[in-house]
């Protein structure tokens, strides 16, 4: 991927003395080995709570941090105390990318640390160690069959690879944003929300259509219709009153040339399906706006 390992920071579970759940030293040691392979002598720090992290900050050389269950424990109920009876659960280890100390708003968030809500660190991955079960008496016991559940944010990892906090700066979205700027004559920086929604929704619409889904008023087809129509409404906010999907969809398609054969077979049908929906909705919009204009001219205020 090309991410600088010096900008990677990880967190582990500090343990719960009350419930007899040990500190996740094993994960910390494994992380030290991983960092060492990258030429980094990763020091370990015990933080505890996010509030304590905001007071302490991080020290030079620290890359591995122990936090409490509010940060590094997974269950349906959140923390250790609120884990539902009978549920599987366990500690987790999260991976963060560092965008630089200058990104932290100390006045609002305190000193920077991985679990801060400030802009310095962004979580890009998480390993949940499903190794416990909560018993009827509230205690915890080890599961007979344990597993590791990894989750990684593809777009966040891509953003970290280009050192950008904005996933819409990645190659998956940037061509779409640039085309929207060209069509609308407006800049992304002043219209981030509308352009992000358009790019995100049209990508989703493309992928749904590529699997054979068509816009309708029922179930999945209705979800597809809503995506397309919301993108068009946001385009209206940008002053784009003409059909524009034919300029955007081919840019999305370029990112998915390696899709499975079953999807590739239907891909050629995507653009006609989406543009038909666009044209139909624009006609509906025009009729609706025309009626609203008539009502306004009649003096009807809505009060």
Locations of the language-model features?
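Structured aminoacyl-transfer and RNA-binding surfaces used for tRNA recognition/handling
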Residues: 1-261, 271, 275-300
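Conserved catalytic-core motifs characterized by acidic clusters
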Residues: 265
């Amino acid at each position: 991927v090309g991410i600088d390992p010096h900008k990677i920071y990880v967190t582990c579970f500090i343990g719960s003395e009350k419930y007899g759940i040990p500190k996740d030293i094993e994960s910390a040691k494994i992380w030290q080995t991983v960092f060492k392979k990258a030429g980094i002598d990763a020091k370990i720090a015990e933080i505890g709570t996010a509030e304590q992290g905001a007071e302490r900050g991080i020290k030079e050389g620290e890359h591995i941090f122990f936090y409490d269950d509010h940060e590094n424990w997974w269950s349906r109920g959140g923390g250790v105390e609120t884990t539902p009876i009978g549920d599987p659960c366990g500690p987790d280890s999260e991976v963060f990318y560092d965008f630089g100390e200058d990104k932290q708003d100390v006045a609002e968030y305190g000193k920077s640390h991985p679990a801060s809500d400030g802009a310095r660190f962004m979580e890009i991955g998480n390993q949940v160690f499903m190794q416990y079960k909560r018993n009827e008496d509230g205690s915890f016991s080890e599961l007979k069959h344990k597993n590791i559940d990894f989750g990684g944010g593809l777009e966040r990892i891509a953003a970290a690879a280009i050192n950008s906090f904005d996933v819409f700066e990645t190659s998956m979205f940037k061509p779409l944003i640039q085309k929207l700027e060209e069509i609308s004559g407006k800049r992304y920086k002043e219209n981030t929300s509308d352009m992000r929604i358009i790019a995100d929704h049209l990508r989703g619409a493309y992928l749904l259509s590529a699997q054979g889904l068509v816009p309708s008023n029922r179930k999945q087809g209705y979800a597809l219709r809503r995506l397309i129509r919301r993108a068009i409404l946001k385009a209206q906010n940008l002053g784009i009153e003409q059909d524009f999907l034919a300029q955007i969809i081919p840019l999305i398609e370029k990112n998915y040339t390696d899709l499975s054969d079953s999807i590739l077979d239907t891909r050629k049908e995507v653009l006609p399906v989406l543009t038909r929906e666009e044209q139909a909705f624009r006609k509906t919009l025009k009729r609706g706006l025309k009626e609203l204009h008539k009502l306004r001219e009649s003096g009807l205020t809505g009060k």
